[in-house]
Amino acid sequence: MLTSYQLESPALSWGEDGAPHSNQFDDVYFDKESGLEETRHVFLKNNQLSGRWASLQKNAFVIAETGFGTGLNFLCAWQAFLTEAASDKQLHFISVEKYPMTKSMLTDALKMWPSISHLSQQLIDAYPEVCHGLHRIELEQGRIQLTLWFGEAEDGFAALDADVDAWFLDGFAPSKNPEMWSDNLFKHIHRLSHQGTTFSTFTAAGIVRRGLKNVGFDVRKVKGFGQKREMTVGELNSSTAPLSARMSQGQAWFNLRQDKTSEITKVLVVGAGLAGANTAYALAKQGIKVEVWEQGNCIAGGASGNPQGMLYPKLASQDTPVNRFYLSAYLHATRLYSSLDRHKQFWDACGLIQIPKNDKEAVRFQKLLDEKLYPEAILQASKDREGCLFLPLSGWVVLTQLCETLLSHENIHVCLNTKLESLSPIELDDKTFGWQARSKYQQAPLNDRQACFSHVVLCTANDTKALGVTPKTPDYPIRGQVSFMDIEKAKAACQTIGESADKIDFDKILCEFGYVSPSINGLLHFGSTYDLKDLDDRVREEGHKRNLAILESLLLLPKETFNSEDCGGRVSFRCAVPDYTPIVGPVQSEDVYQQAYSTLTKNAKWQSNEIAEPIKQLYINIGHGSRGLISTPLSGSYIASLITGTPSPLEQKVSHKLHPSRFIIRDLKRSQIL
C-alpha cells in the first residue's frame, strides 16, 4: 500500500548549455542541439503520425509514453497535431513519470526551446501539483488532453483504462534504468493496444525488443537519428491483439466495455445541477452536441444552487481507492475552476482551515502532518490557528455562476421546465441504437428527431428512482439548511458584546462541525444542517440557531452572539449514498446481473469471466452528497470518456468503487437478491 502521496523530484544538474541532466540515472533528458529534431524523427516520423492524422476517421487519437521528463515529446506531438489533423479531432496523450519535475524545473528546462514557447507556457500554467496518481490536463479548449501518471510506470499502466494507437517508448537508456522495462510493463503495453497499434523507441536494446516480441508486437530495427546507428519500431499484429483494453481487470461485473457501433449524434443530459453541468461541459468540449433537460425553472435550482459552496476534500490518513478518487477530483476541480474564472468572478482559491472537532481528530491531524502523507502544496499546518490543518488550494465558488458558465458552451442547449417523463429504447435506423425521451412539459411526437438521442446521462440526484429506468440504488436525501447574515449586522453584534468586528473580516474558509466562508456581496454564508429523514423544504428558525452555534464556535465567539432573526436561509436536499461515494458509470440491468452472477449468493469469493453487458448507451452520475463541487468535474469527464471510448481520467480500481453495479454485486454476495 502507498505510504505517501509525496514523490521525489529528480536530482538535476544543469550543463553549461542549460540542458538538464539526471543525477539519478546519469543521463541527459535531451540533446540541446537536436532535441526537437530527434523527437520528431524517433517518435512522430517512425509512428507515421503525419499520414495517420491527416486521414484520421475516428474522433480521437491516443498516444502513450514511458517517461514524461520535460514534456518535450508531448509538446512536439501537440504542435504537429494542430497542423496535421482536422480541427474536429482530439489528441489524447498519456505519460508516466516516476520523478516528476516541479513547475520551476519544467520552466527552466523548456526555456531552451523558444520555437514552442507558446505551447510550453500553456503546459507550465496547467501543470499539476507533484502528487502521486493520475492527473488530467485539458488544453486548446479540450482538443488536447494530457493524462499524467506520477509514480512507477508499471503501476501507472496497470491503473490505466485506455485504447492506445501509438507508443512513445522513451525514458533513460535501458542500461541505466532496467527496472522500468519489466515483463509486467510489456504485458500492460499489450493490454492497452489494439490491432495496428504502433511503437517507436530510440533504443535497440535487447531487453526492449524481446519484451515487445514476447507480447505479440512485430519488431524491427531501423536507422536511428543522427549518429545513432539503430532504433526500434513495430506494430501489434492481429493474431495477438487483445479483445478490449477497456475490459475490467479481475472483476467482470465492473466491465466498462460497450458496443461502439452506434454513432454519437446528440446526448441528453438530464439535470442542470453540478453533475449535469459538468457532464454536459465535458461532452461539449469533445465536439458533441448536448441537450440538457432541467425540470426546474432555472439552472442549479436544487442542492447545487446554494449561494456559496466550498471545496472541502476531507483527506484521509490511509491510501484507499475512494481517497484516491477524492484527491484526484479535488486537484482536477481546482484546475478547472481556475481556468474557467481567471478574473475571480465566481471562484476564489482563498484556502481552507480545518479545525479538529475533538481530541481524537486533533491526534489524526498531527499524524497526517508528521507522516507527510500529502505534499505541502496540498496539506500543511495552519499558521493562523494552532493544531489545525490548512489546505491552500481550497476555495469557494458561486454555484449558480459556475453552472451557468459550464452550460454556456456553444455545443450545449438547455431546456428549462422540462421534466423527463419516460425513456424508451429505439432503433434510429437499421444499425443505430438510441433513446426516445418524452417530457411532461414538451410532449414531442414519436417521429420528432429532437426527442431522439444516441446516449442519455441521468444526473437526476434524488429523482432518479422515480424514473424507473435504473436498478434500485440505495441513495437517499439529506436535508440541509444554510444560513446567511448581513456582514454589517454580524460586525455590530460582535461590537455589542465587546468583541472586535475584525473577527468577521477573515479571508479563509473555516471548517469544523460546519463551515463559514469569507463574505460575498455583503453577506456571510454559514452552515449547514444535516437532517436525516426530514423532507421539510421550509427554512426553519431552529436550523438558523444550529448554524449560528456553528458560526460562533468557528469564530471563537460566545454563545448567542448572533440573533436568528437576522438570518436568511435556503433549504435543499443532498443526494447521499451509504458508502459516501458517488454512483457514476454505465447503468446495469438488475435482471441480467442476477442471472449472470447468481453464484455469488452461494460463494461470495466466486470470480467470473462472463461479461454482463450494461444497458446500451445509458449512464448515471448521482450521489455526490455535500462534496459535489469536488467530485462532479472529474465524474463528468469520466462519463464523457465512457461515451466516446477515450482514455479514462480514473484509475480502474477507482472506477470500480464508483460503478453503479457495486450495489447489485454487494446484495448478491449478501444473498439479499434471490
Swiss-Prot record:
Q: Which Pfam families match?
A: DAO, Methyltransf_30
- Report residue spans for region: tRNA (mnm(5)s(2)U34)-methyltransferase: 1-237
Q: Which UniProt keywords apply?
A: Cytoplasm, FAD, Flavoprotein, Methyltransferase, Multifunctional enzyme, Oxidoreductase, S-adenosyl-L-methionine, Transferase, tRNA processing
Give me the reactions it catalyses. 5-aminomethyl-2-thiouridine(34) in tRNA + S-adenosyl-L-methionine = 5-methylaminomethyl-2-thiouridine(34) in tRNA + S-adenosyl-L-homocysteine + H(+)
Residue numbers spanned by region FAD-dependent cmnm(5)s(2)U34 oxidoreductase: 270-674
InterPro entries noted in UniProt: FAD-dep_OxRdtase, FAD/NAD-bd_sf, MnmC-like_methylTransf, SAM-dependent_MTases_sf, tRNA_MAMT_biosynth_bifunc_MnmC, tRNA_MNMC2, tRNA_S-uridine_synth_MnmC_C
Q: Which domain of life is it from?
A: Bacteria
Write down any Gene Ontology CC term. cytoplasm
Q: What is its EC number?
A: 2.1.1.61, 1.5.-.-
Required co-factors: FAD
Which terms does the UniProt entry file under GO BP? methylation; tRNA wobble base modification
A molecular function (GO) held by this record is:
oxidoreductase activity, acting on the CH-NH group of donors
Cellular compartment(s): Cytoplasm
Record has Secreted as a keyword: no
Protein's job: Catalyzes the last two steps in the biosynthesis of 5-methylaminomethyl-2-thiouridine (mnm(5)s(2)U) at the wobble position (U34) in tRNA. Catalyzes the FAD-dependent demodification of cmnm(5)s(2)U34 to nm(5)s(2)U34, followed by the transfer of a methyl group from S-adenosyl-L-methionine to nm(5)s(2)U34, to form mnm(5)s(2)U34.
What HAMAP family would the database entry show?
Answer: MnmC
Task: Write out the similarity annotation.
Answer: In the N-terminal section; belongs to the methyltransferase superfamily. tRNA (mnm(5)s(2)U34)-methyltransferase family.
Name listed for the protein in its UniProt record = tRNA 5-methylaminomethyl-2-thiouridine biosynthesis bifunctional protein MnmC
